[in-house]
Amino acid sequence: QYDFSFFEYWASDYAGHKQDMPWAIKQLEVFDGVLKGLLTNWNMENDLVLLTSDHGNMEDLGTRKHTAAHVPLLLFGAKTNRDAFTDVSDLTGVTPAMSSLLGL
């Protein structure tokens, strides 16, 4: 039993920098399968899955650089856990909200 687990899917980041749309789409399809498996087996009544990114770049394959695109903050799980992120408006708010949720 763990209180916190972190997973980074670097392949989508690499796909954006590679500027290869068919390969980028394949990476998103692979991640969709991983996420589906996770959410299908997740305890939604007690736990939380947080999905976000630190930058965009796959939406604009005309550049290899990070873009300023707004990225989503998706939360799956118990409403009481999701409520800890109500005031999060950008990436800098994720760590304080997570720390509060974990009682740190």
What are these regions (language model features)?
Residues Q1-L104:
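Feature captures the catalytic ectodomains and active-site-proximal regions of enzymes
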